[in-house]
């Protein structure tokens, strides 16, 4: 793969033109070595048992180096193919039969966004596109030519900027493969909360539970997908992938970066984090897969810090009074979770199944037919799940509103969408019969009854915590809309819970603890390196001294 030095490669670090593919690959292999520190490189050599960097490895060996236990064949295949593509950077269009340990190290550099941008020397480089290409390219063996294909030399910046002339509009990722990738990201989210946390997780144990949450993200990418079986006959385009990453799941790829960075730590430098231990307590709604899904949207220090159970309807009863008694003493942000079964036919349900629903229909204004555009994934009697971040303490507001600009509605099932506050004053808790509202003005309450006034993007919960309605009809309210078609969904509430999050001080402290763990591991790496004293044999094994190599920076 061109790991050996070439006399034709310019010694200047600013070289941009190369006479052959071999020279180009060799130069970027060496540059990758300079973007990992000396302790990291020594640790990596220890993890691969001192094997030469140009030695080849197979799928099982890659899983061992990544410390992934019980990965299924699909996961092994997609990770191996991803590394196989990135190992040949910047000539990612041309993939080779063998993956080497140098290729794994180069992949580690490329999948770390900060290192990658430094590696390519372009702050505007589209890292998300690179990840997509690594998942999408069909791998083929190609003989390396010693000369460029034209009379011109190889222009490295052009090769990088054009992704080696890969046409992303022609690429697709099978939806089945993307589902496995999304499931892996969710499965590893809690275990990779820092780069050197111990991966003490059997990823096959709860795979199906995480896959259910991953399917919601997949449906957002491709709305033609309803079930996991539909993934067998659909694909995901780059545009679909990019749109979801940018607007719905900004943190989705973080576990991939952390997973790859584990190769730079020896076992003795890995730590057991409190966040990686089983959740205590859990509930019907708060599970590890759900928190992993939330972590694709919100910072992981918010999601994986010690959540406090405040109110669970199944335990305390479905009433505003119970909610108030349990949740109102919490003087910090909280997450409201609401799950229910969508009501597909209002009149039939009110007449034949639940006559109390007729009262809710009378109080809640009907959406115009021309504004109702229901996606297939949201049609019928489906489970709906919403998580709402309330950044201020709960309080009774029978006339006013509370809630700041950080209020966010996240739909988690059957698709994932994010609706952020556009202005403060977006929540009410009305004990006079108005119920709970997110994104709406106060309901009109008279002796004759209640009239809800739903905002353009809003979640309305009736005062008995029995029925709810989610509306998404565009701009104009206190919550901004998503890119999904306008629609409204009423549902029977089956579970409602409120969980307390740490305040800014607590979250900052949690983040500092995790940062300290990473810094401490790096400090131990440096101490361990110094302890070898003048053992040049180890350093030569790592390729840091001798053989005219300068090594990485400490």
Curated annotation (Swiss-Prot):
Pfam families: TLD. It is found in: Cytoplasm. Its main location: cytoplasm. Keywords: Cytoplasm. It comes from the Eukaryota. Residues 284-502 form the TLDc domain. GO terms for cellular component: cytoplasm. Belongs to the RTC5 family. May be involved in a process influencing telomere capping. This is Restriction of telomere capping protein 5. It comes from Lachancea thermotolerans (strain ATCC 56472 / CBS 6340 / NRRL Y-8284) (Yeast).
